[in-house]
Amino acid sequence: DDPAAVTDERMVLVGDTLGALQELAREHRRRLAIPILAISGSNGKTTTKELVSRVLAERFEVYATRGNLNNHIGVPLTLLAMTRDTQFGVVEMGASACGEIALLASIAEPNYGILTNIGRAHLEGFGGPEGVRRGKGELYDWLARTGGRVFVPANDPVLMSMAAERETLAAECYPTTLADGVEHHLEGDYNRFNVAAAVAVGRYFGVDDERIRYAVGSYRPDNHRSQKIRTGQNTLILDCYNANPSSMQASLVNFRQEPLEGCTRKILILGDMLELGDWSDAEHRHIISLAAEIPDARILLVGPHFAKAYRSLESRPADTTLYPSQEVLAAELRKHPVSQALILVKGSHSIGLERLADLL
């Protein structure tokens, strides 16, 4: 607001710093003139981004979103980090309301896109499930208008329908059954969809099958996403970077099928799912009912949303304990350690369940 504050020739006075950042990133992207693949969806964005970028890196000089810098600030920063040596950009796009993907697409101007899935995430901001479909579909809208191409899992009727609704949109449909020899270190059957997307993208862009298998097989998840860890006392399935009803349900279905492999019991540590608005109570009750279907499992619920939902149930599952916070559960675990258990740890990142790992 004060021109006198500009005291260095490297400083530029602008009316809107955020708008200037976004416009600068857009212009930089245009000058690079490279293919850019945008990835969005309710679940699996970051994992798919990591897999896809590793596969493409077997043939191209790739720059991909670091961490989860996937919003109106993170996407411009990602684009500006690309250099003249970059041959391919992979950009993750997150959103919690309609209009946000449209903005990000107008900045990154992707040529290709992947929607991993349409699930029940950020229901409050999107205004419900239909809003999620409409908001995430903004990526398809952009690509349909600009002559782009999407990669669509052939077994997903929602995404297939969304692609078909846009008559000018070119679509590359791919199977979600993994080809022989493709192995990965991701926990959960649901992750095969992310792997299948990476395989499809690699093949489309001419990456040799052997290099695809190597790239997928060498990727090991971190940051508490789909990690299986054997401690001195227990086996942990850590998936607590984020949680919404769709990802929570997928984790529970997978956990029910997990063999004990030397453990004597199963324990679920489930943290609140956030940003669900009016749908919160019903979604948390549904997750509790799914958890109760896992035979002989001990259920530990963390946070006020799960507590409210649990107390509203007419029939409450046995062997369930409520904890107001991660800190209270941590204190309990210090007093009464658990051992020889297969433990699922799943919840929204802000609940802080990853801090329990050292106690398990």
Question: What are these language model-derived features?
Answer:
Residues E92, N191, T235-N244:
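Active-site-proximal beta-strand elements of phosphoester/diester hydrolases
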